[in-house]
Amino acid sequence: MAAERYNPRVAEAHWQKVWEEDRTFETDNSDSREKYYVLEMFPYPSGRIHMGHVRNYAMGDVVARYKRAKGFNVLHPMGWDAFGMPAENAAMQNKVHPKEWTYQNIATMRSQLKSMGLSLDWAREFATCDVEYYHRQQMLFIDLFEKGLVTRKTSKVNWDPVDNTVLANEQVVDGRGWRSGALVEQRELTQWFFKITDFSEELLAGLDTLDQWPEKVRLMQRNWIGKSEGLQVRFTLDGKTAPEGFSEVEVYTTRPDTLFGAAFVGISADHPLAKKLAENNASLTGFIEECHQHGTSLAALETAEKKGFDTGVKVKHPFDENWELPVYVANFVLMEYGTGAVFGCPAHDQRDLDFANKYKLKVTPVVMPKGEDAAGFSIGETAYTDDGVMINSRFLDGMTPEAAFNEVANRLEQTSLGNSPQASRKVQFRLRDWGISRQRYWGCPIPMIHCESCGVNPVPRADLPVKLPDDVEFDRPGNPLDRHATWRHVKCPKCGADARRETDTMDTFVDSSWYYARFTAPWENEPTDRKVADHWLPVDQYIGGIEHAILHLLYSRFFTRAMKVAGHVGIDEPFKGLFTQGMVVHETYKANGQWVAPADIRIEETDGKRSAALLSTGEPVEIGSIEKMSKSKKNVVDPDDIIASYGADTARWFMLSDSPPERDVIWTEAGAEGAHRFVQRVWRLVAEAAEHLKDVAPKTGTQGEALVVSKAAHKAVKAVGDDIEKLAFNRGVARLYELVNTAAASLQQVASGNADDELKSAVRDVTEKLILMLAPMMPHLAEQCLAVLGGKIAGRETLVARSAWPEFDPALVVENEIVMPVQINGKKRGDLTIARDADQASIQQAVLELDFVKAALNGSSPKKVIVVPQRIVNVVA
């Protein structure tokens, strides 16, 4: 009998309600089973989820459901990364309070995520803007302050003139603010910092332990931490050109071997020598101001045009006092890195070469490839940066650069300048302390109080939390907390005098740097329950975008170590396994120069050529490139529309099936329709056979068709489990397609009433296994299929979501037959399929019975038959 068409809208709502009432996915911390913590990066509540969210959370849900089925006590929570500038922008534009805007968005997105059927423990849900959460964050801040891991200092900062706030170096991308896109300026402000540099060596060494992280992410962090071993060299200033009070410049270099190729010394615009020289030089003052118009990070400097200002000051070469080098103020030298001064060797550093060519400085090669002729070796437009042999370097000639490094270091360490060595070996890190002060309202208040008599002190713990005031105005840019009439005024906790609160709030990356720990016991009064946190952490599988490789992931690694120092956790690394999924991309469409949404067009195909037209007018539409889904280009597909049309399981299945999870997936309507057809096919096959299978006990087949279909199912159980363990979801999907294709005829035979008892038992067993394997990916369909079969697994009534992963029989997984190529006189003519354990005589006999062998021999006997066991057969005619 034909089954009714599967209705995902009805089925999915039903099973979501069942799971909620059953509290299927709530996690008990006291459960004694082995733990497994899977976490996807929690979302910012921007208003609606997008297909990228669907892919990210579908992947995490497959892992969570699979691990539950494998017997683990799984923690799979969800929350909201809810502070940040967009809420303030919305407040200014729409006259709505950030809190109201944020919680409305959370309600919408929570409903959307629930419609996906995710196996989340919603009982642990929190938003980082919840007072209960940022109260504990303020407790952590004070703990870290008391441990010496928080400091306040004046420094050059990246100022975003549009968002009117400070940005960390990591938040400046190509010289622009990561959110606003505005060109960043340098300003000098007093800021709060986390002393992440105290952990530079630890953070670097810890990367070697993260063998379940992508190598690309580890390399990005390794480069960002930027450990270098070099030499700090004192260059004597020429007394005739140097200003009063300055006798030397200290230079940090990682290439002291190239000293004889030096063409100039570059100093930072903030170097004391530059500031002194600018006192009487208006042109230099103007150049220094120009240098302050870009970000403070190395990345910002690397992308800016290289510029310099010749100060007229000279320095003497460390090995030749008659050799003078010009001193430039250079816009690519950072005061915060090394000593704020470098020497430039144009032949062996591309930046220095570009600079030297611009200012017509001498280029002298001092390293050349082995085997080259020194007299004929020169540098063109590209610096030589590889290894080789030293040239044009006096006593270093003929050495390797490594040997030359040590020779220069040894000589200068033994040379006195004044009362100390002219050089010393130093280790430097590119990593800077994390400036967390933000001049905005919608963030976690920094719990500090400023008193003219007592200085700056923490808010007493009894007075926490410092709550954000609700009565603020967003009628102009800047921080409303600075303008609040009463909130900022407070008594000093030490002397009782009038004082003021800190009005800066914390960088929102602080909020996401410890949330994974809070999820382990979000009801605790302390930031963590140490015993519970140490049980659950580290997160076993973390899933999110590679765009967070430096910012969020590095900060979280620091925060875990800082929390360990403060006694809140006992681990070093927060995330044992990291998976970075690809993006969801879509075609772009344009009509009359304007972007057009996919929902507003129709696609047609004629003679293999695709064309598009507007639904409203039929006007032609240009089909553009495939790009990341973005609102600006309107190539966005709303998950609500997909779920309403096809169901959540279809959306999940397509997101998992179309490409390897680490690669981008191209969303297509055809792909979604194909996934939906598979959903309907599975339902139809199971539902039409259900009446004949309801009361049948599952049993593995032993012969004929029953054995064939049982073997296919057992092989799939092993393979799909292996695929999920490796996060190779698309391969698991492909195997399930294969199993359905293999089992379809048997299911149809059962449905027609023509199956014997053995086949029915085998098909019941295969169907149960299929349902259990589909469940992590299409959980609603799996529950509906089991329900139509009577709601039992192995004779016991249960939910699929509470059922174990199916077992496989190793004997049925092993291939009992092998395929051996057959050659005649050394050339392959065909194949022989034979039992794996067949002896040599049996193989020879079987080969001689093959039609193509008989034809080749033409009635004659072969001279010999050579058998390489389980590999190949060669018939010599």
UniProtKB/Swiss-Prot annotation:
UniProt source species: Brucella anthropi (strain ATCC 49188 / DSM 6882 / CCUG 24695 / JCM 21032 / LMG 3331 / NBRC 15819 / NCTC 12168 / Alc 37) (Ochrobactrum anthropi)
Catalysis performed (reactions): tRNA(Leu) + L-leucine + ATP = L-leucyl-tRNA(Leu) + AMP + diphosphate
One BP annotation, GO: leucyl-tRNA aminoacylation
Annotated ATP binding sites: K631
Gene: leuS
Family: Belongs to the class-I aminoacyl-tRNA synthetase family.
GO molecular function ontology, one term from the record: leucine-tRNA ligase activity
CDD domains: Anticodon_Ia_Leu_BEm, LeuRS_core
Alphabetized NCBIfam families for the sequence: leuS_bact
Keywords associated with the record: Aminoacyl-tRNA synthetase, ATP-binding, Cytoplasm, Ligase, Nucleotide-binding, Protein biosynthesis
Region forming the signal peptide: none
The protein's name: Leucine--tRNA ligase
Protein's cellular compartments: Cytoplasm
InterPro entries noted in UniProt: aa-tRNA-synth_I_CS, aa-tRNA-synth_Ia, Leu-tRNA-ligase, Leu_tRNA-synth_edit, M/V/L/I-tRNA-synth_anticd-bd, Methionyl/Leucyl_tRNA_Synth, Rossmann-like_a/b/a_fold, tRNAsynth_Ia_anticodon-bd
Motif, 'HIGH' region: chain positions: 43-53
Short motif 'KMSKS' region, span: 628-632
Name of one Pfam family that matches: Anticodon_1
